[in-house]
From Swiss-Prot:
The keyword Chloroplast does not apply. This is Uncharacterized protein PB8E5.10. It is a single-pass membrane protein. InterPro entries: B12D. It is found in: Membrane. One of its GO terms (cellular component) is mitochondrion. GO terms for biological process: mitochondrial cytochrome c oxidase assembly. Keywords: Membrane, Transmembrane, Transmembrane helix. The chain crosses the membrane at residues 21-43.
């Protein structure tokens, strides 16, 4: 039950807001979410910031650099 009460806490706080402030709270929430997603996208897409190769490139590089062990018959 503790998890459910944590999840419901922001909703209950929103319910207690006066009716006049609810549109402002919604607008602030949407703007904050948009800012977070935009920054995440910019950080992920900028090659200067994101220098590590992708998972696919790492896997391909490992396959190419594997040293084959000699097989003795």
């Amino acid at each position: 039950m503790a998890v459910l009460s944590r999840i419901m806490k922001p909703y209950r706080a929103f319910q207690r807001l006066p009716f006049e402030l609810k549109p402002l709270a919604i607008l602030i929430g949407i703007a904050g979410s948009t800012a977070i997603f935009t920054m995440g996208y910019k950080i992920y897409s900028d090659p200067e910031i994101r220098r590590s190769p992708s998972w696919v490139a790492q896997t391909q590089q490992k396959e190419e650099t594997k040293v084959k062990k000699p097989q003795f018959h």
